[in-house]
Amino acid sequence: MTREELDRIAFDQPAFARLLGFRLVSAEPDEVLAGLSVTEDLSNRNGVMHGGAIMALADNIGGTATMINLPQGKTTTTLESKTNFLRPIRIGDTARARCVPLHKGRTTMVWQTTITRGDGKPAAIVTQTQVVIDWRE
């Protein structure tokens, strides 16, 4: 895959990611970086980033990482996702996500995403499995 193809696939984010404010920073086959500003719209009643927003950030970066590693004609969807919440991320902070492969196989890919706060401390660690599929209408 050429650099142009990789960037086109990686930076062509779905509408849900744009709605969240997902910002892709860089995309390489073995590391994808992204960020998300924590706004009141993404918070829970305690004034910190909602767990669902953290999981959505991780799911989107994991999907992006898989998409740039797929053979031509294939697509992906999440098969399994597990999140360990470690620390809160407060409104006004930025959640930074780093996604790296644990396994890149023919039928599944497993990714680990570490989400950190602005102070660099880990807020969540997510492990997800993506299945490689042929898309059918």
Where are these regions (language model features)?
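Terminal targeting signals and extreme-terminal segments of soluble enzymes
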Residues: 1-137
